[in-house]
Amino acid sequence: MTSEKAGGYISKITLNNGDSLPIQENDIVVFVGPNNAGKSQSLKDIYALSKEKSPSVVVKEITITKHSTPISKVLAGVASGENKGDHTSYDILGHNMNIWNFSDKLFAQNDFYEDYRDLFIANLDTSARLTICNPPSNITRDGRKTHPIHYAAFDSKYRKWLSVSFKKAFGIEITPNTQYGSQIPLCIGKPVQLTEEFEDEQSRLEKYASILDTYKQVHNQGDGIKSFTGILLYLMLDYFCTYLIDEPESFLHPPQARIMGQIIGQTLSDQQQAFISTHSEEIIKGLLEVCPKRIKIVRITRVEDTNMFSILDNNEFEEVWNDPLLRYSNIMASLFHKSVVLCESDSDCKMYSIIESHLKQKSKYILKHCLYTVVGNIVWEKLLLHFVL
């Protein structure tokens, strides 16, 4: 039996048009839509509203369902506290959190996470992902862990997971270099294996350090590698209940974006949820390949200052995804187009595309953001019932 996770989960979001979307504890909600429609703003709203009731733009309000596990227990398990007399102070990834003897009771009574938000909500915007890759200060093996790299540096469970996940996308491992000095950079390269004999272990350690010094370091690489690694560093910490991930495909080649979708879907437990904004068909395909039952799609459009929403829930998505013809077609690309033409055959797609191209050249006729896709005659009805956004 899985023990109850401390914190809670977002069980409902209410959009600015009054529509409500119920959310399960393990749902992965994906926001899609054109630029400036409100995808990223939705994540910002959720992050702000999870702390306290506040003005918002796209998401009007959220409902948080809390668990009964004391937050003092999870804080003590995540970080070493500093006794301040009448309370204990914790540093959680740069966020200071204090616990008094009455804190657990007040937390349970409040509708929001308040000052403990960043213990349960991981807000992964682009800036957070890039900067988290910077080497943290070195600590003793049993010192206070204030950075995700500290966990990978001193716990083999985290180190191995981080390296294996990185290798899936880039074909090479990463290693925290605890011998670097005052900092712990992540080094890119094959894990060091010393086979020669040394006169003592100190000599072996010095040789190990000298080899790692020749490796490239993650924080000095391009934004694609840093963004990918940044997401991994947060996913690695399993005490988070909810992840807000803004455009995880940023700076990534499409194959790596698909792998990122797979890793997110595989890593999040049944007591973790995510809200993701994306322009990437590959992110969605990666998620669907590993956890189709967990996916909800919210397509956001905007006319002037008015948002409109179309929602595709778990059951409808799974039914469409389980059809082999649709699964291996480009139907997922329809989520990112304004118009979709369903064709019986590939030759029909080509013919209509040629006609459209001709009309665009000869007149002012423009069919914006149109996708021609092959679905076959048999699955038309299913698509019209379940996949029209």
Residue locations for each model-derived region?
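Extended helical coiled-coil dimerization/tether regions that scaffold
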Residues: 2-6, 12, 123-242, 254
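Hydrophobic, Leu/Ile/Phe/Ala-enriched alpha-helical segments that form helix-helix packing faces
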Residues: 46, 50, 162-174, 264, ...
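Conserved helicase/translocase motor-coupling segment
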Residues: 338-389
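Conserved P-loop NTP-binding catalytic core
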Residues: 45-140
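Glycine- and acidic
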Residues: 29, 144-149, 245-248, 337-339
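Short active-site oxyanion
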Residues: 150-152, 271-274, 339-340, 369-370
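Switch/communication elements of ASCE P-loop NTPase nucleotide-binding domains
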Residues: 1-55, 198-333, 349-353
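Short, glycine/charge-rich beta-strand/loop segments that flank catalytic centers
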Residues: 61-64, 179-186, 281
